[in-house]
């Protein structure tokens, strides 16, 4: 009785229901039980069908009683609901299943005997005898020892090895001796045991073989990397620090098989570098001046051609420059090097390995330094021809520091990297006098010194060195031809007041100025006049003032003054020797009258006490001439017209040296008048005049003013008709005579008087002007066509410029300033303005023709995919930027969209890489050419002073094509077919391209694996009929592939293995051969014949004179011989060839003995090979030669060989060993063997397997 535990008392399952619920656990338990019972039945059937009769049934019984008991005992331990039985129930279940097992083992024998008795009649089989009637084969004796051994050939996936699978390029830094690179070697479907690679030195081409095996290789494999997505691939890395070409030579895997090596290579070169060769030692910066040209030199090292990118900071902006196609002189790289993809460069295609050596190239970088400050050049990237690139990000950060105000003057100039170049551009100094000129001289007092003020806009901290020349007074400052009296050099600081002290009068001229680094420019005014002013003096003459009626009414003191106005005179008037206050009067005239008109009568003394002027202090006067005593007891008058109102202030006029001047004087009184006046120059009396006039308005003519100084015209006295002469006390007229007339001249710091600039630029011709602003300058311009034009300019700066926009010759014609006409110092002086030439290009290596304004250059035609380039020579001021358009017109006359490209270089030659990807005609139209002077100038070529647009034409021919027309067709030939007959099959090949063609064809024998190549030349047809070669008519299947086709253009195309191939099958004509060469047979044995061809076969033979017809669906015709006799085989035909083969003479044969054969000495051998390799299968015979045998290749199975894939029969073996080479996977077994007399097997079962 089966009992279950109540649900309320049932314990929880061993596996919690939260993980697997109870129904699912029951399902799993029942499933295991069913599986055990099913396997029990299978085990029973296997036991009963075993050929080993003495296997005991007790073993089966004990085994399954134990298995069932274990299962039933363990089941309650899981406490599965509804399957959790009590121990008593479990014991009962074990007993029941033990009884069932006993019943099965005891009843099985009877059951199989009864089944066998029913099925036996159906398995009995009869065979045909030689007389074509069926007989019982029980008389056939089985002897398995006659054929021993089995050869299993497994073709493993083809193991491959490839160095540098990603086609990377490697480089080593020449400065780092401890640097290594990791060369990748990738293995596919294999594990290496031995590696041999070669290293070719780039300099000497010396090849060194290196072997890696044992512990070294195991260490590399342990650190190898695998791709999770491609587990068959494994990559190891070889460390090396030697430059050169690396290739794999030999690889052996763990099966001791050679591994196929892909054609690949790894190149290790020196990393490209770029340093500035013109750096000063210690990395110190160079010193330059504004306007200088800095000639830096960049040393580039690496595999040419190289590309260099550098940036520079000019104090305000960053500029990026790219230098393309940097190559050494006389450098002619292989065409493939010009490919845009460095991975196209492979040295096994015939490129000289020494081309990969490093070249050292010096590239000039010429820069016009336009602004002061620190200029920085930094290399940011260098790339060589192989794609190796060195970047310098730290240099970008270095440049950014300068953008934020850092300079090397801050103390880190010694830390400049080698690929950073620095030049400090200093401001050029200038110098001029301030507050002193020819017109405004400086005063030098006796026994003293005076300070001359200098001005400079120079803003640097460095001191200036100023050269000053002194000339004697009296020379013309504008035309000094004598040597200076002295030359002195002064050190001044431009950031503070700059003064020089002089102790001698003269003409001081600034001759030069320079700073610590730069020469400078002397600006106007550059001349300072230093004079010693005269001491203040006065002469006094007293005259009584009398009236005709009243007599003396006072006195007049006439003061004649010498010195520098204004004058201050101290005087006093005393009466009767009584003291009185001192009075002062100030005047800027050289003559002055003091009128003493006492109001009261008395005895008076008029005293002139002292004098002072603008330069000298107060000086007391003494002597009788400076006072007058008088006892005091209208008049004729004259004044300058400007002071008719009685104003006593001085009249100031300006005149030019060498001019005259008229001064109107108004006379009062009774005509006629006698007027006396005096002329003073530089406060010294020069001449005195007395004139008569009847007109109250008299014009006083001043003589020619031949000296550049100050003239004072003083009215001394006037007398009218009454005879009363009166001394005058009226205002003077001062005439300031300019010491020089304005002058103009061109200025050139280098005395070339030539300006060169880009066409259309605004240029400034420097002038030097003397005089007072503004200046009115007239000049002429003569063009290149001798056309003359006149122009006028108004200028306000003595260091002005003429702003011009046209080239030609400029000549100064006249100059005048605010008051005087002037002169041109050198009327023959001319200034030349020239345009710098525009850049242009030339292509001397190509033939050209002209059509209109375009010159067409013809580049040699190439084939699609080939490398091509042409050289363009550039003329101008580098660096250059060349722009061109590429237009393709393909073979169908379709015009592709225009593609624009740019090439930059600092050299005068640039290589333009041609595009050959798509067949057609390429037009390379050069549109713009820029250099350092001109931007986007038209790119032209100049021939015989004519400009043309340059267009390069190149035809790219398409690659020829070849393909089989009937790829699905199987071409079948009999082994003895004459392929030269007109009815022989031909293989049609379609050809495309320019005829005649050359074709390379490969024919592979699939049985032997051998490949034969045939080259067919001078093919003119577009459809070529290929005759299969007679020598290739060997048994088996053949694959005909197209390997390469070449057309009349010289273009060759390799045809990939993915393109369909033609399949050819060569079969034998139906043939018959006895399995053995005996004339006697063994009684009871079968008489068997090997049939060659495609079954079914029809065989005609005679037996004891009776003609028989036999058919066979296999390659073996077997008949049991029940009677002695002679068998004569007459003819045979098969299904494949449909031709009947007559056997002449007929084959007569008798079976006599049974031979034996052993494969690989009778052992079961398993050998592994790679795809493409061959294995050797050996067969050893016993018996009487000659031997013949048949063997089969079966498919590989998991436990036993699979179906038969092919069979072969070999006859005429006179040796006891026979070897077969095969590259086809399968299990090779012998089916039959025959010697001179007998064959084996003899029974029909064996025959059916042959």
UniProtKB/Swiss-Prot annotation:
Membrane-crossing segments per the record: 80-100
Membrane-related topology note: Single-pass type II membrane protein
Organism: Schizosaccharomyces pombe (strain 972 / ATCC 24843) (Fission yeast)
Pfam families (alphabetical): Ig-like_POM152 (PF24312), Ig-like_Pom152_1 (PF24519), Ig-like_Pom152_9 (PF24527), Ig_Pom152 (PF23664), TMD_POM152 (PF24097)
Broad class of the protein's primary localization: nucleus
Subunit relationships: Component of the nuclear pore complex (NPC). NPC constitutes the exclusive means of nucleocytoplasmic transport. NPCs allow the passive diffusion of ions and small molecules and the active, nuclear transport receptor-mediated bidirectional transport of macromolecules such as proteins, RNAs, ribonucleoparticles (RNPs), and ribosomal subunits across the nuclear envelope.
Summary of the function given for this chain in its UniProt record: Functions as a component of the nuclear pore complex (NPC). NPC components, collectively referred to as nucleoporins (NUPs), can play the role of both NPC structural components and of docking or interaction partners for transiently associated nuclear transport factors.
Region span, Pore side: 1-79
GO cellular component: nuclear envelope; nuclear membrane; nuclear pore; nuclear pore transmembrane ring
Taxonomic lineage from the root: Eukaryota, Fungi, Dikarya, Ascomycota, Taphrinomycotina
Record's protein name: Nucleoporin pom152
Compartments reported by the entry: Nucleus, Nuclear pore complex; Nucleus membrane
Segments of this protein annotated with the region Cisternal side: 101-1250
UniProt keyword Secreted, yes or no: no
GO BP: mRNA transport; nuclear pore organization; protein import into nucleus
Coiled coil: none
UniProt keyword terms in alphabetical order: Membrane, mRNA transport, Nuclear pore complex, Nucleus, Protein transport, Translocation, Transmembrane, Transmembrane helix, Transport
